[in-house]
Amino acid sequence: MNVRISGEFRPGVINAPSSKSFSQRYILYSAFSNIPVTLKNVSFSDDERIALEIARACGADIEFNDSLTIKPDFRCPDEINAGESGTSLRLATGLLAARRCKTFIHEEASLLKRPLDDLIKTLSEKNVVFNNLDNGIMIDASNSIPSDSIIDGGRSSQFVSSMMMYHSLTSGSLKALNIVSNDYIKITIKTLNDFGISVYSSNGFFEFGKTLMKGNKICIEGDYSSAAFWIVLGLFKGDIEIKNLKSDSCQPDAAIINIINGISERKIDIYNNKIVVHKTRFLGDLYIDVDKNPDLAPPLSIIGIFSDVAVHILNYRRLEIKESNREENIISMARSFGALIEKNDNEMVIRRGKISLPERISFSDHRMIMSSIIAGLISSGDILYENIENINKSYPGFLNDLSNLGYYILK
């Protein structure tokens, strides 16, 4: 679907969608651990729906009312579909191994390109057998033998999270090396704690205690990586209140508050469960480390396109292995609005050039589409946005939320 967006900005209120980093973990762990859970504030993004379908394939009964209730009755599935969800693929791989399943995992084309090697290597040492096929991977853990593990987390913290879930359901300890995005490990620890699993953690070493709890009721906190789009828009356009954001969140992308407040004349106001963003002037260059916050790179790059300060994206090469090659796509988006790009081995710098307005923008990556829309609204350009349906992967309510800020969609 292709759309244009019209209207004039007005101050408004946004409810941040659910953090799928939390919701996917809760859904999958409930299904594989046989522990029921009731979840409030689930936005039903494509990635969350994939996790729910995996839970169903494992025998879980799913009920939808004002909240989402998962009543598991675990059985090893013959097959599951991970779609384009890297999180579901990696977490389910460890969980299937823990339950000694023989299962085929379907993957969409883009997911087949994303790394899984380090996780496969660690599980293979436990006699888990993997066979790569054209449209997915076959895992056979029927003869697996649990033991202590070492995992290299240098390419993805999800490998570490997957093995943490594996050991929480089996036995043995875990040593994780070269952990990137350590706050995602904290999300996994909180998930396990909420299911009654105690986690001892010290310098990448993890041990697990098992006191399983029943009948959990959990409210999923709002997602900072989704809120980032509105934060950037508000910095250029005016006041936006964003609700359902915990001030003490362990989400790594909550770092956006300190990143912005460190360079902004007007600070983001922070309350217990909401923030307020104001139009501001920037006082210095912005630095974003992709090893810590890869999902913030697309929206924060917009600041370099339209402001007097530069955006420095550190460790940018890691962007190559996201849902798309976001390194190339950020450069494409920035240049389409006239920005200047400089690169060295470890840093990409985006600076404002002579502002230009593209006639159309075409990305398949959900975060790039939403970032482009925010850039277009800041520029006030008449732009055709393509593949708009792909934003459902993470933020199905994005277009509706635009209406809270004075905009409307022309299809």
From Swiss-Prot:
The UniProt entry's GO biological process terms, in alphabetical order, are:
amino acid biosynthetic process; aromatic amino acid family biosynthetic process; chorismate biosynthetic process
Pathway it belongs to? Answer: Metabolic intermediate biosynthesis; chorismate biosynthesis
Q: How does it assemble?
A: Monomer.
Where in or outside the cell? Answer: Cytoplasm
Q: Does the keyword Transferase apply?
A: yes
The entry's protein name is 3-phosphoshikimate 1-carboxyvinyltransferase
Q: Which PANTHER family match?
A: AROM/DEHYDROQUINATE SYNTHASE (PTHR21090), PENTAFUNCTIONAL AROM POLYPEPTIDE (PTHR21090:SF5)
HAMAP family cross-referenced by the UniProt entry: EPSP_synth
Family of the protein in this entry: Belongs to the EPSP synthase family.
Its biological purpose: Catalyzes the transfer of the enolpyruvyl moiety of phosphoenolpyruvate (PEP) to the 5-hydroxyl of shikimate-3-phosphate (S3P) to produce enolpyruvyl shikimate-3-phosphate and inorganic phosphate.
One Pfam family of this chain: EPSP_synthase
Which residues are involved in binding 3-phosphoshikimate?
K20, S21, R25, S156, S157, Q158, S181, D295, K322
Keywords on this record? Answer: Amino-acid biosynthesis, Aromatic amino acid biosynthesis, Cytoplasm, Transferase
GO CC, sorted alphabetically, is: cytoplasm
Q: What residues sit in the active site?
A: D295
Report a single Gene Ontology molecular function: 3-phosphoshikimate 1-carboxyvinyltransferase activity
Which InterPro entries does this chain map to? Enolpyruvate_Tfrase_dom, Enolpyruvate_Tfrase_sf, EPSP_synthase, RNA3'P_cycl/enolpyr_Trfase_a/b
CDD domains, alphabetically?
A: EPSP_synthase (cd01556)
**Disulfide-linked positions:** none
- Known catalytic reactions: 3-phosphoshikimate + phosphoenolpyruvate = 5-O-(1-carboxyvinyl)-3-phosphoshikimate + phosphate
The record's EC number reads: 2.5.1.19
Organism (species):
Picrophilus torridus (strain ATCC 700027 / DSM 9790 / JCM 10055 / NBRC 100828 / KAW 2/3)
Protein residues bound to phosphoenolpyruvate: K20, G86, R114, Q158, R326, R367, K393
